[in-house]
A protein has these predicted regions:
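Conserved C-terminal beta-signal and adjacent last beta-strands/turns
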Residues: 663-684, 696-798
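Extracytoplasmic loops and strand-loop junctions of Gram-negative outer membrane beta-barrel proteins
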Residues: 71-72, 126-130, 201-207, 260-267, ...
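Face-selective signature of the C-terminal outer-membrane beta-barrel domain
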Residues: 229-240, 275-305, 319-495, 577-586, ...
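Conserved small-residue
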Residues: 585, 589-618
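Outer-membrane beta-barrel translocator domains and adjoining extracellular loop/strand segments
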Residues: 102-103, 170-176, 246-262, 306-314, ...
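Membrane-proximal, glycine/serine-rich, low-complexity loop/turn segments characteristic
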Residues: 3, 9-307, 320-359, 403-424, ...
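Transmembrane beta-strand segments that form the barrel wall of outer-membrane beta-barrel proteins
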Residues: 124-135, 159-161, 485-489, 553, ...
């Protein structure tokens, strides 16, 4: 015997800004999807929304073998890619999609993940198909989930399907509106923040992907094709249909309400139907290292209906119907050119077309309690009930473009010049009408808002800007000071009157990076921004936000100015897997757009009007996590603190609203190969609100435990339990528990079939609670959820 050579693959390796995790070094055998793999990795988290977080930052790009996987969101990947296909997980910090710009731009907030597949999964179809069934008191349960993947150097094809009525949400309405498709605004760092608004009226969102009843149909396909080395073509298509039943009981405490009125208790039963569609196409042409041309197009189309039966202790029974069929088309053209070693050019342009048409209808049976509002709106009182409606349409057309030039002075410094523009046009039309008993429709004449129940307004925005930034590396520090000069031109035309606002402004910014060690960084960022609101805030005619909230805009609104300071710290020790991040953010807004609210005499129905506040609004947030591995144990503590203070006027009286939320979490997790693994967690939340003369404080205590075990190498047992105590300063308002469990069998890890029995909500909990605050009220909500479901499933592995 001459020698013994021990070959060992490091669980984690660091190369520059890239962390590479060897998945099998952390897997325990109970993993079934990418989400399970990522949860095992130190420094990587899956948040409550199902998104991947690294260094406390949400990861928006996930690739497989370097190819985009439904660009713009990581949830589809984590919930669907099978765990047995994952070889390596590469975390790419300071990620730049354009290699030519990697050395001249700061990308500290850009983190991407690339999944490397195992050799047996390349050039072959892989994935699984799951089918399941069960029974409940209400109806029969079903589940079909095909997930198919193919990867080769030339092309890739992925298909994900999901049809179920057991509440497993593949793609929610919230996911749809948060799905960026990978688009980033060229002016995102210019200092201008322009809102196009969100013109949904009041569609309810699922809480923690739970509701009283959820039916889902989902299909998505993603592809990439490289016909030659210089050309890449890709895209995806997504369709989702969901039918949801929601039930809520809410107690509302108003900040300032007319004398003699009690707080409000409401009950609502809501039916929703959502059809959501999305289509994206991308092309990238790179003939050589000095040229790169990109074109992307993303189309969104949806059709949503919400029918709500609402009962108020103050306003009686109300039937509300809301529908909307919006669409948008976004396209971008980017070209990057490297002239030589010291001169780089980049052109980015993005064009957005958006059309929204929300419709609202409310039928109020209790006429007496709505009399004051009806008189203000000019409604006809000689009817059986008040049946009012509103049609609204908002059309947006925006061009966002810029030209960048970098001059590399030496190895440690460069100068960046930016010439850009934002051109935006919005058209806003709305009218309020009343349905009479004889089936005719009339348009009322209000006695408020100058007698206008209609809007026809054109809003134009223009920003021409020139920016300069200097980047210098000095030792462990990187300094990037800069300033941009903006020429703004804003106008709105309504009722034959044109209102303009033209001004010039300098906006400075500064970024300092302190690279303490190879894997330890301190980052300071300051930015001054000009904030502009959308067209709806300028429309002076009355608008129904809902039956109890009327709105009248102001044509004379001006922009707001904000100062933002952010300090972040990150450290990773690959020897004991100590992971630390901390982030502090402070924001101060001057001349911010706030509302003055007037309650209709004798009711809690109010009319709000925006104005530029003379008082500064402030917010301060801090969050951090410390995580360390001790052998087979991984411990972590995390805190999130958010404080905000803003000013408004209610009943002609100034009101200072303060909110302070705190969430603390401690977690202990094991990582055994053969023994069962346990994840213990305790979450403690405080929601403290001071709204004018009123103050409320709510507490939530949530211990939880998760157990997963591989038994006899064939059985996988998983269970999770959480207990929630929701209280105020005087009493416990509600306690609720959730317990889920599953037991699956497969002959071995290479078996084609796996059989599983799964139970959700074993304790048959019927509701959960949460608190929330708005600018005029604080509310505590009881939210009803699905009952106990037990299903049997069969999974076939390709």
């Amino acid at each position: 015997l001459d020698e013994v050579e021990l070959v060992y693959e490091m669980p984690v390796t660091i190369s520059g800004d890239t962390l590479v995790y060897n998945a099998d070094s952390f897997n325990t055998g109970t993993e079934r999807k990418l989400e399970d793999v990522l949860k095992n990795l130190p420094g990587v988290e899956i948040n409550d929304d199902g998104q991947v977080e690294v260094e406390g930052k949400v990861v928006n790009k996930l690739m497989v073998e370097g190819k985009d996987f439904f660009d713009g969101d990581t949830k589809l990947a984590t919930k669907n890619i099978p765990s047995n296909a994952v070889d390596k997980v590469q975390v790419l910090k300071n990620y730049s999609e354009v290699s030519q710009l990697g050395g001249v731009t700061n990308n500290q907030d850009n983190i991407a993940i690339n999944i490397k597949l195992k050799e047996g999964k390349k050039n072959f179809w892989f994935g699984n198909i799951t089918a399941g069934a069960g029974d409940s008191k209400a109806n029969s349960l079903y589940l079909v989930q095909p997930k198919l993947f193919y990867y080769s150097p030339e092309y890739s094809v992925n298909f994900i399907g999901d049809i179920n009525n057991i509440g497993e949400v593949a793609f929610s309405r919230r996911d749809y509106f948060n799905f960026s498709g990978g688009f980033q605004s060229p002016s995102r760092s210019s200092g201008t923040n322009l809102s196009l608004g969100n013109n949904d009226i009041g569609f309810l969102l699922l809480q923690n992907n739970r509701a009283k009843d959820i039916n889902t149909k989902f299909g998505a396909a993603n592809f990439s094709w490289s016909p030659k080395k210089t050309l890449d073509i890709g895209g995806f298509a997504i369709f989702s249909n969901s039918k949801n039943e929601l039930q809520e009981n809410r107690s509302v405490q108003y900040t300032v309400a007319p004398a003699g009125l009690a707080d409000e208790d409401t009950q609502s039963n809501t039916s929703q139907n959502n059809d959501l569609g999305m289509l994206k196409l991308t092309t990238k042409y790179q003939p050589n290292a000095n040229n790169q041309l990109e074109y992307e197009a993303l189309g969104n189309l949806s059709k949503s209906t919400q029918d709500q039966r609402f009962n108020s202790s103050l306003n009686g029974s109300i039937d509300q119907l809301e529908t909307t069929n919006p669409y948008s088309f976004n396209q971008s053209l980017n070209y990057y050119y490297t002239l030589n070693e010291t001169n780089i050019f980049a052109f980015e342009a993005q064009h957005l077309i958006k059309d929204e048409d929300p419709f609202y209808n409310a039928i109020l049976e209790d006429k007496a309690n709505y009399e004051g509002t009806a008189n203000s709106l000019g409604l006809d009182g000689a009817q059986l009930d008040y049946n009012l409606g509103q049609e609204k349409r908002v059309q947006s057309n925006q061009l966002d473009a810029k030209l960048d030039y970098w001059n590399i002075l030496n190895k440690k410094s460069n100068i960046n010049l930016t010439l850009g523009t934002i051109l935006s046009h919005q058209q806003f039309d709305s009218h309020i009408f009343q349905f009479l008993d004889n089936q005719t429709e009339v348009r009322p004449t209000p006695v408020i808002a100058n007698g206008a129940a209609t809007n026809d307004i054109a809003y134009n925005f223009s920003d021409m800007y020139l920016g300069v930034h200097y980047r210098l590396k000095s030792g462990k520090f990187t300094f990037t000071p800069g300033v941009s000069a903006h020429a703004y031109a804003i106008s709105n035309r309504q009722t034959g009157v044109k209102t303009t606002d033209n001004f010039f402004r300098f906006l400075p910014d500064m970024n300092v990076i302190f690279q303490i060690k190879k894997s330890e960084t301190l980052n300071l960022n300051y930015r001054m921004q000009t904030q502009f609101t959308d067209v709806s805030q300028f429309a002076s005619g009355l608008v129904l936000n809902n039956y109890n909230s009327l709105f009248s805009g102001s044509p004379d609104l001006q922009s707001a100015l904000s100062h933002n300071v952010n300090l972040s710290y990150y450290s990773f020790n690959m020897f004991n897997y100590t992971n630390v991040f901390a982030n502090i953010n402070y924001n101060k807004s001057i001349d911010n757009v706030r509302t003055v609210s007037q309650f209709v005499p004798g009711s809690v129905i109010r009319v709000s009007t925006p104005f530029n506040s003379n008082f500064a609004d402030e917010s301060l947030s801090a969050n951090g996590r410390f995580q360390r591995t001790f052998g087979k144990l991984r411990a972590s503590v995390r805190a999130n603190l958010n404080y905000s203070k803003f000013n408004q006027f209610i009943q002609d009286r100034p009101s200072v609203n303060e909110s302070f939320s705190q969430t603390y979490r401690a977690q202990l997790r094991t990582n055994f190969r053969t023994a069962p693994n346990v994840d213990l967690s305790y979450r403690y939340s405080i929601q403290d609100n001071n709204l004018g003369p009123n103050s409320t404080k709510f507490f939530t205590k949530s211990p939880s435990i998760e157990v997963d075990a591989l038994i006899l190498k064939s059985f996988t047992f998983k269970t999770d339990y959480s207990y929630n105590d929701f209280s105020d300063e005087d009493r416990t308002i509600n306690t609720y528990e959730f317990w889920n469990a599953s037991l699956s069998y497969r002959k071995d890890e290479d078996a084609k079939f796996e059989y599983e029995i799964r139970a959700t909500n074993l304790l048959d909990t019927r509701s959960q609670n949460q608190s929330s605050a708005s600018n005029i009220s604080v509310s505590a909500t009881e939210y009803f959820i699905q009952p106990r479901y037990v299903t049997f499933r069969v999974r076939y592995e390709l």
